[in-house]
Amino acid sequence: MPCLAPFGFVCAGWHDAAVRYSVDVPNFGEFAAPEVFAEVARRAEGAGWDALLVWDHVVGEKDLRWEIADPWILLTAAALVTSRIRLGTAITPVARRRPSKLAREVTTLDRLTGGRMILGAGLGAPVGGEYGSFGDTTDTKVLAERLDEGLHVLDLLWSGEPVTYRGNQITVDDVVFRPVPVQRPRVPVWVGGVWPNKAPMRRAARWDGAIPVTAGWDSGGPPDLTEVAELVTFLRGCRAENGLADRPFDIVIGGTSPPGPAAGRDLAGPLADLGITWWDERMPWGDDLGRAEPILRRIEQGPPRI
């Protein structure tokens, strides 16, 4: 399988492009069937999309009683029917996962795909459903600390070197995790959060990309260019403060693109001018969110390339 990596990551076969295009689907509803998710992946690759991202819920909105699948099994099904597109989560609530298990899962998939994995990471939502339903804390300060420590431990484990770590939330005692991911120095980590909340975007600026939720994403409207410009400026400032201004970094903006190539280009072009590196195609919140047919129809139309 060809090996893909983000800018600055080591993995043969990656090609440069101004903007790349992903499809973003939930892990519930019709997508909870692995064969359906695999078909979505196969068609997305055939239609020229660059990545397929899946949500990572265990409960979600409790009153909706969704059928929900494990995202890692879904991604495995997708890996077996694709050879080019990147695969990842958007997003995995790292604070509710054991770093040892998550590190193994992501590494195994990165090796299975020949280096095509992306880990989208964040707190996740709704906190009450995703954490409180199983007796876990819903204190967001504690969860944020667990998230930060979890990401740090993942990075250490993926090095393949002996790891000993003592944090407030996580402890690791003399562990070596091998094999390591194909992508070096690690599988790229994109951090999510709701903009204009600045804390999650400060966190994102310390890693490899930001995949924020911006205003109007759930209604099918295009992103507000002023809002995106403010976000890009903020992220670049944080990168500079961290001494990372010259390092590769992805900015992923999502929404529902308008139909037709010309309209799609009119959407993607101004966003590219602002500095985004990925457009993430998302279905608006509603009755069609968990249905495969609408997203397959959109996939077949191809990405809104500039």
Residues covered by each model-derived region:
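Active-site-adjacent structural elements that line small-molecule/cofactor binding pockets in enzymes
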Residues: 2-306
